[in-house]
Design a protein with these regions (language model features):
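Acidic/histidine-rich alpha-helical segments that form the ligand environment
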Residues: 108-151
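Short acidic alpha-helix initiation/capping motifs at coil-to-helix transition points
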Residues: 38-43, 73-77, 115, 123-131
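Helix N-cap / loop-to-helix initiation motif
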Residues: 56-57, 91-92, 130, 142-143
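Preference for long, well-ordered alpha-helical segments
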Residues: 133, 143-184
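Iron-sulfur (Fe-S) cluster-binding segments and ferredoxin-like electron-carrier domains
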Residues: 38-40, 78-97
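Mobile cap/lid helix-loop segments that border enzyme active or cofactor-binding sites
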Residues: 1-58, 115, 179-186
Length: 186
């Protein structure tokens, strides 16, 4: 694929961006955002806060991230988060289902997980979220959870479009892990 935006290596990073490099390779999202350090320094803390540990557990967040990424067909995010989702406690069958490779009903039997997937699908989908979807979310999640889940979908959508538009490459270690776990590249 054509490289649209070069990843800035740490020695060449602008001063405002260097703090996000941690003395090494920060990954393609940070290394490309470094072209505009004044946006990097506001975007990454928000993205980090949304993706980091919170009242929502790691597994829940990975359900949202993988499902959103699959619906948006973001190869980079699906591939990068598949190992993370497995590490968060999701089974291989559940991750395959979130990726859209098998039926969700065969992999998930927990009503909260299914409600989470349905809320994610509703927020990602075109047009307004239906009253039925809102009611289903209200039954399963408290208000703070609905807010955080919705922001998580939104941040994931932003990253999906960013990674897809720039055709960001997936780390070689991730590609190897996908193969070792029996997952094909997206």
């Amino acid at each position: 694929m054509m490289v649209l935006v070069r990843q800035i290596p740490e020695p060449e990073a602008p001063l405002l961006a260097k703090v996000f490099y941690g003395g090494g390779d920060p990954g393609p999202i940070t290394a490309t955002m470094a072209h505009v350090p004044e946006l990097l320094e506001v975007a990454l803390p928000f993205i980090g806060a949304t993706l980091s540990p919170s009242a929502l557990d790691w597994r829940t967040k990975e359900i949202v991230i993988v499902r959103t990424s699959a619906l948006m067909q973001c190869r980079y995010c699906i591939d990068s988060h598949t190992p993370v989702a497995l590490d968060s406690g999701l089974s291989s069958a559940q991750v395959h289902a979130l990726r859209g490779e098998v039926d969700l009903a065969t992999a998930f039997d927990n009503q909260r997980d299914l409600a989470l997937v349905n809320w994610t699908d509703a927020v990602v989908g075109p047009g307004p979220v239906s009253d039925d979807s809102r009611l289903a979310a209200q039954v399963m999640f408290c208000e703070a959870e609905v807010v955080e889940l919705t922001l998580l979908v939104g941040v994931t959508l932003l990253l999906n479009r960013y990674a897809t538009s720039l055709a960001l490459p997936v780390n070689d270690d991730v590609v190897a892990r996908l193969a070792s776990e029996g997952f094909s590249r997206s």
